[in-house]
Each structure stands twice: as C-alpha cells, then as structure tokens.
From Swiss-Prot:
PANTHER family: CYTOCHROME B. Heme b b566 binds at H97, H196. GO terms for biological process: mitochondrial electron transport, ubiquinol to cytochrome c. This is Cytochrome b. It comes from Ctenomys flamarioni (Tuco-tuco if the Dunes).
Length: 379
C-alpha cells in the first residue's frame, strides 16, 4: 500500500513542494527569504483580517476606527502594529530576496523571475493602498501626490486620475475602493506566489555556485524545514521587538494627525521602503519623465536576464562584478536617504547623481564588467 502522503491528490502536491522536494545541498541562508516572505504574507493576511473586522472605510470615521482598534479592541494595538511593521519586514525580505537573485544569477529562470517582478509590483500597490487607510495627513497627501502622477500620461491622464479618485479629489469614494483593493490584492498575490513556486519547481533551485546541482540533491524535509524554522524564529524575534519596543520607529508622526485637505504637511514622503523610488521620481524636473523613471526603476529588473553577458551564472567567483553589486546596494541606500530629505541643495544634486548612477551601474557597468571578466578568464 502506498503512503497517503505520496498518493492523496492534495497531500501529494504539498509533499512534492515542501517534503520530498529535491533541493541543492549547498544553499545558504540567502535562500531562507522565500519561506520568510511566505510567512510574512500569511501573517499580513491574518492580522489584516482582524483589523478589517473593526475598521470602517469612511472618511469621517476611518481615523477614529483605527484609534478605537488601538485603545478598545483586545490586543488591537498588537494586531495593528504587527500589521504595520510586518509590512516593513515584508519589504526588507523582498529586497534581500531580489538582491540574492541578482547576485547569484537566479534571474536566468526567466519565468520565475518575471512573475517575481510582477509580484513586487502587486505588493507595492497593496502597501501603498494600505498606507492610505488610517486616513492621517500622510495617508491623504501621499494618496493625492501618487495618484496625481497618472495625470502625466498623455491624453488620458487627467480623466484616468478622476476615474481612480471617483470624484474631483481624494475623498470617500477613493478610500472605499482603496480598502476594497487592499483587501483583495493579498489573495491575488497568494495565487501569484503559487505560480512563482510552480515555475521554480519546474527548474529546481539555483545555488551559490551557480552550477547544476542535480548530482547532489537532498530532501527539503527535514534539512530545509528546520533551517526555515530557524529563520522564522529570527524574523519573529525582530518583528516582535520592533512591535513591543518601538512600534512607530518606521512610521511618520504626521500620520497621527487626521487628514486635512486644507493643510499640506511640509514634507510629503512615503513609507521608508518606497523612498529609493521616490528619490528617483523627484530627481527628474519633468513630471512625465519622473513617472517613467519611477516605473522603469522597478521594471529594469526584467532586463537582468537580457543584460547578463557573463559566461558564469553566479557572481560568487567574479570579484569585479561583486564590487559593482555592493556599489549598487550602497547607491540604493543613498537614494533611500535622499528620498526622505527635503527638496533643497545639496540633496537635489545628490539625488540626481544617485539616480543616474543607479541606471548606469545596471545598464552599462554590470554587463561590460561581465564581458571584461570573460576576457580576463580567457573565455
């Protein structure tokens, strides 16, 4: 008689994905972030569900309902801050996960990579709409500024913005639809994650060497299940420390002021995880140019498989490319810092230089360095 785990139509799928899955024997802790992102998504859906039970998506009561959650609902403050800081953890892991993919050449799995980039867009959209829901000053003005960018689209722009707003400004209709989309998108993301995994399991995982690991595979369970649990333990320790000790560390104080269309905050800025893209947007004086640069700063990830010119897959044995990779990381940190600064000298110039360098490293320096390394290795 065959094992139920291997014969049952449903359990069989789980078995092939998480138990008997052949995995490379040498994958490092950088491969932990996929499972951590899965846990983050589950946590966000769960905490979000409980928040939605008490939240009201109406401009007159939204802010008060969030206050009510924090003050009157049993452990409401805990649920709210786990959800808010959980989003920050989600993005930290997303950026690590993408960075790992770039460093080790995982983008050569084109199907997996492209659905991953689409996932990034979906998560960014979800986070943006979630930030609008508490209806604080930064929620309102963030929504106004970002949705207004669509008016830069030639011909249909202004009509499109009013259509998204559901009126002539960010108001009741906007908040209601943002709540609806914020609720449905995580489930769409979950479906996309399944497709992401489906494509990944077609090829198997990459590994730090970037070489084929078919000759040395080990079962996912117990080796990587236990490793994932350790990662989850670290993640939960960090998240709960953040929630319990400094829950507002990553938030904006302006969002504790109820939304007021008649009073603009001195510095409108998004959450920290969007600051790098915001800096790129602001570095171009033209509205349409800025919007295109903003979209392309993320969309550029889809070009990595095309731009790959090295004869080696991974950067593990390519010191020059490694230097460029860390230059790119430093550049992104500079952009993040600039995104949170006011629009004045010297920040404007630094932002423009960093934005230019970002595209220059990815589009020109990385491919040409890879070609040079091929030459140096006489390939």
């Amino acid at each position: 008689m065959t094992n139920t785990r291997k014969s049952h139509p449903l359990i069989k799928i789980v078995n092939h994905s998480f138990i008997d899955l052949p995995a490379p024997s040498n994958i490092s802790a950088w491969w932990n972030f996929g499972s951590l992102l899965g846990v983050c998504l589950g946590l966000q859906i769960l905490t979000g569900l409980f928040l939605a039970m008490h939240y009201t998506a109406d401009t007159t009561t939204a802010f008060s309902s969030v206050t009510h959650i924090c003050r009157d609902v049993n452990y409401g403050w805990l649920i709210r801050y786990m959800h808010a800081n959980g989003a920050s953890m989600f993005f930290i892991f997303l950026y690590f996960h993408i960075g790992r993919g770039i460093y080790y050449g995982s983008y050569t799995f084109m199907d997996t990579w492209n659905i991953g980039v689409l996932l990034l867009f979906a998560v960014m959209a979800t986070a943006f709409m979630g930030y609008v829901l508490p209806w604080g000053q930064m929620s309102f003005w963030g929504a106004t500024v970002i949705t207004n960018l669509l008016s830069a689209i030639p011909y249909i722009g202004p009509t499109l913005v009013e259509w998204i707003w559901g009126g002539f400004s960010v108001d009741k209709a906007t908040l209601t639809r943002f709540f609806a989309f914020h609720f449905i998108l995580p489930f769409i993301i979950t479906a996309m994650v399944m497709i992401h995994l489906l494509f990944l399991h077609e090829t198997g995982s990459n590994n730090p060497s970037g070489m084929n690991s078919d000759s040395d595979k080990i079962p996912f369970h117990p080796y990587y299940t236990i490793k994932d649990i350790l990662g989850i333990l670290f993640m939960m320790t960090t998240l709960m420390s953040l929630v319990m000790f400094t829950p507002d560390l990553l938030g904006d104080p302006d969002n504790y002021t109820p939304a007021n269309p008649l009073n603009t905050p001195p510095h409108i800025k998004p959450e920290w995880y969007f600051l790098f893209a915001y800096a790129i947007l602001r570095s171009i004086p033209n509205k349409l140019g800025g919007v295109l640069a903003l979209v392309f700063s993320i969309l550029i990830l889809m070009l990595f498989p095309i731009l790959h010119s090295s004869k080696q897959r991974s950067m593990s044995f390519r010191p020059l490319s490694q230097c460029l990779m860390w230059m790119l990381v430093a550049n992104l940190l500079i952009l993040t810092w600039i995104g949170g600064q006011p629009v004045e000298h010297p920040f404007i110039t630094i932002g423009q230089l960093a934005s230019m360098t970002y595209f220059f490293i990815i589009l020109i320096l990385m491919p040409s360095t890879a070609l040079m390394e091929n030459k140096l290795l006489q390939w």
